[in-house]
Amino acid sequence: MSTLVIVRFLVADMSAAKKTLADNAALLEEIGTEAKKSGARHHRFAEGIGELVAIDEWDSVEAFQNFFDDNPKIATVTKKAGAQMPPSLEFLAGVEAAGTF
């Protein structure tokens, strides 16, 4: 069973944070490639009120934490984006059910 991970980064300037993501596309692609090798299944960003949210699916909580904790590339992007650290983390167990897609 997979683990869903919600990572909430507080940001003061959402426009600047989104521009940072666009300006650092190559680095984000590198991070994504490494994440897949470490157990990530899906990843996307979303915008909330005053927060940039990463919504991920991982093989396990441990796989996510081993990848995320002290990752210098993630630290670089979050710092450039003006995100407050540490982010809020939420872990949810996936539930297999008919109609899931």
Predicted regions and their residues:
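Short S/T/G/P-rich N-terminal loop/turn motif that feeds into the first structured element of a domain
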Residues: 1-71, 80-101
